Amino acid sequence: MSLIGNGPSVPPSSTKASLFSSPTTSANPTGGLFGSTTGGSSLFAPKTAGSTTTSTTQPTSTTGLGTSLFGTSTTANTQNTANAARPSLFTAGNSIFGTSTTQPGLGASSLTTAATSNQQAQQQQQQRQQHQQAAPTGALFDSLLARNKKQAEGETALGELPSLQLGLADLRQRLRKLGPSSDRPIEPGKAHYFLAASGVDPGAAVRDLGALGLQAKTERTAASVGPAAGPSGVSTTGFGTGLGEVDVDTYLSNLQTKTTLSMIADGLERSARDFDAFLEENVTLEWEAQRKRIYQHFGIKPRDSSVAGTTTAQPTATPSKDGQGTFGRSRRKASQPPPGERPAQRMSILGRSTMMRSVIGTPTRIGAHAPEFSDVEARKDSSGAAVASVDDRFLREKQAKLAEKIREFNDARQRGTPFYICRDLADLESKSGDRHGPHIVEAYRAVMEMVGEHPDAGEAPRERQFAKMYLDPNTQSANALAMRKQILKGATTFLEKQFWNEVNSLIAKYPQDANLGGLPDVVSKIKAYIRLRIARKTLVPDNVELQQINGEYVWAIVFYLLRAGFVTEAAQYVNSNQAHFRAIDRTFSGYINSYASSEERRLKRQMQDRCMSEYNQRIRNAPEGSIDPFRMACYKIIGRCDLSNRSLDGLQTDVNDWIWLQFNLARETDRSLELAGESYGLAELQASIREIGLKHFPKTAAEDTNGSFGMFFYLQILAGMFEQAIAYLYPFSYVDAVHFAIALTYYGLLRPVDAASAGNELLSHNTRSMPQINFGRMLGYYTRDFRAANPAAAVDYLVLICLNADEAAGGQQAQAALCHEALRELVLESREFSRLIGDIRPDGRRIRGVIEERGPLIALGQEDDFIRTITLQAASFADDNGRTTDAVLLYHLAEDYDTVVSIVSRALSEAISLEIGEDPMRLIPVKPRVTNAEGQVEEAAPGSSLSLAAIDDPVELAKAMMGMYERDHMFWQKIREPNRVACSVLLQMADIKSLVEQGRWAECLDKIRALDILPLTARGDPGTIRSYAARFPSLAQPVAINVPNLLMWTVLCCMRQRERLAGGQFAGNESTARLMMDELKQMTVDLMAYTSQLRYRLPPHLHEALARASAD
């Protein structure tokens, strides 16, 4: 049988027992080891359906070999044809490890030809035993009698053995295989089978013997045992125990070794657990959030995890992946909750943010950078490459001016004085030089008309005056209707004033063509404007006849009076020329008077119907070119005729005239009282503007070439589409978008997104399909351009998030929490603690920081709690990052004076632990607080505050803080006694180290004796030395760490002082010098006795130094 299969068949006479069943016979034994053919059988696969089997009873084997491994089989599958049996895989017969009767297959000759003489003898003996058991008892006696006769006659049994027909090479190879191999141990498989058949469990026996603890030596020396070793490397002479392990000393030695190794293993395991716990608790790495951010950065859409139903339905089909080491997930702890169940407060790397993601975003350089919002595309050109931003210098200057204006804006809010934010921002934008700047300026001025911001008249609306009206969720409410009317009225008024300014500027520019003359009233200026347009041939197209009365184009005068918003003046002009107008149109004077007297600029129903009827008749019946186009325009405006065609036919108009006409025709009234053809309000106007934007304006920054996006932004602002306008402008000019959003939010004209929302879109819609802007994060992301250089300016922007923290916006607590979270992240990122949170005066009083100064603007109900909370978080962050001075400052500001002393003691201990002669440890000083307008540090009086002191020496810092606390009992009583004592001792140890460096040995010994830590006054008394040693565990850890250094300094002082006394530098009596030398030597002996009782708590080199000192 071949190992692979398809080998030659075995002879018919070879019949062997199977390993897992009784012997089987095969009609076509050509099956492979791992499969079967049509006519054969495989070891691991069943026979084909075409094979027929019969069952025969087999006898039970007494040896356990040749039959089934798990018991006696009563049936066996045989085929109809008597043929050779299939060899077993593990039995002593035709197996891979025994002698095979088949020819070797391809590539498996070594498995089918190798056999040992022991296996052959066992095979023959088993066959004889089976024949003897099957034979009758008489035949057994006959065989024994014949054998005795042969032995008596001197015959040997060699005749019974088969003849060997092998060469010398074959015999040499067989003999070589009989002996045990030195490089490969003998497999103990057969011994296990024999023991198992006898009812002995080898594994349990080995465990029982190992429990005695007497085989460690044998296992350690198993490599040197050589051939006497068993297969597992353990000597087999004494059931797994060595001969030399029965004595007590060896047993105790082995027990000590095992105990030591067990302690080391337990310590390593405990260290690994502690390290895992430290990583889990202190290193806030949210791999799931990191993976989502990376996916989002590269534009990869993560696989939807909503297939939980399939996973739960088939729990065994797909293994759980939470414990795998896939990207973004940790395999460290299997007890971690799934990513979706983890608390949200650990999603930020900046001190465990309570929001779903960072509010202020990652810091980047100024200029072009990847947008943080998922619905904002990066600015690219037609080829797909990123577009270089405008010169950074101009953008930086613009942002600096805007930041200064925002600072003044917040100052005015704190004082409660009015601030004309739209006017100021429009003035700055007009000086920026941007191509889209004029449109942004016009948009600011349009908002000024909508809200009633008139600086010339001293009128300024209140903060959030229109929030209740604009943010009303019910679109049919009175507030919503009033807001729509105000938007239409403000936009129309702005367009009319814009036209009037254009009229005046053209008359002033071309006075000769205008020929104003006379009284410069409104009508006279309109007449002059018409003369100017006629002179420049821009009034009407060629071949268009206009009606004149006494040389005046009366219809044109009325139209331009209406265009400039002078409706009353237009009615007066018609009434003053009523005779002439009756001659050409008898009903128009009634229409315009009714129009001028109506507050909503609407005609009465009967008059409205008659006006529309006359308009339609003239359009249908009048010959082409016979009607004055200005007359038809006046009818369209006054009677709102033909609303399906909202354009001025036959006139030379510009885009502003067309825009004015759209707003002039729109009305916001009760829709139930209007006819279907007359329904045209703000919603229809917004739909028209939206359609125009999709057709004629760039949709992305890559499509813009000439700044035309500003025009569409201007149209959206006019139409009251404030959220869409901000979202449209942001990819083109995020600086302008942010500040325009600030102005709108200040007046309550921008709907903010829910602060607790997990979305990261700039523009989204609420449940009522109303657009909303992610105002808070837009401000936070904007500050990344400059918050590293000017964190105070970033605070001024972030406090504006609380503009939406009122009842009108809803969720005021959430908006305030968003603002507080942004400020907290800014503090942790910038580390400008002294500027943002506060500073300390020399007397311990605090200096308010920028955040605390803006406290009234950030909706703080309990200001102290928020400042204390953010201060403690920043202090912990600074302490974890090794910024000792920052941590001291912040903990003092948080009034946690005991922690201040602990941190100072720790830093002081580290400084003292350095070896004498090394460079002293330096701390990172606190960033200075005082800065000028250019962001540079101003010179201030030294010692005016902790930040300006620039302390980098731990000893000076400790002295400064302890001196401050000792002078004020309020500070001192809040510090625990152990911390006070520890810091005081460390300061004395710092002085001792300084004296050692200076070589002042006597003074150094006096100060060490005053510390009362070492037994320098014991004079050989063992009880006193033991009492000092017993006090060592009660020392504070920063002090205990430096006790070895103190011992070394003491030994050094004793040795050097003795050398000085021995050198004759003592001017006193010789006997006194000798007594002092003996006393110094006794000190070293006492110190040696002291260290001997703290043997395992002190370094070894200290014992060596003491031994040398005592020997001298």
From Swiss-Prot:
Q: What are the BP-aspect GO terms?
A: poly(A)+ mRNA export from nucleus; protein import into nucleus
**Which family is this protein grouped under?**
Belongs to the nucleoporin interacting component (NIC) family.
Keyword Transport attributed: yes
Q: Which gene encodes it?
A: NIC96
Spell out the Low complexity composition-biased ranges.
Answer: 39-74, 119-135, 310-319
Compartmental location = Nucleus, Nuclear pore complex; Nucleus membrane
What species was this sequence derived from?
Chaetomium thermophilum (strain DSM 1495 / CBS 144.50 / IMI 039719)
> Can you tell me which residues the record assigns to a coiled coil?
113-135, 394-415
Annotated membrane topology: Peripheral membrane protein
Q: What is this protein called?
A: Nucleoporin NIC96
Q: Name one GO molecular function term.
A: structural constituent of nuclear pore
Q: What does this protein do?
A: Functions as a component of the nuclear pore complex (NPC). NPC components, collectively referred to as nucleoporins (NUPs), can play the role of both NPC structural components and of docking or interaction partners for transiently associated nuclear transport factors. NIC96, which is localized to the core of the NPC and the distal ring of the nuclear basket, is required for de novo assembly of NPCs.
Any Pfam family hit: Nic96
| Ranges annotated as biased composition (Polar residues) | 12-29, 101-118
Q: Which UniProt keywords apply?
A: Coiled coil, Membrane, mRNA transport, Nuclear pore complex, Nucleus, Protein transport, Translocation, Transport
Locate the region Disordered: 1-74, 101-136, 303-350
Can you quote a single GO CC term?
nuclear membrane
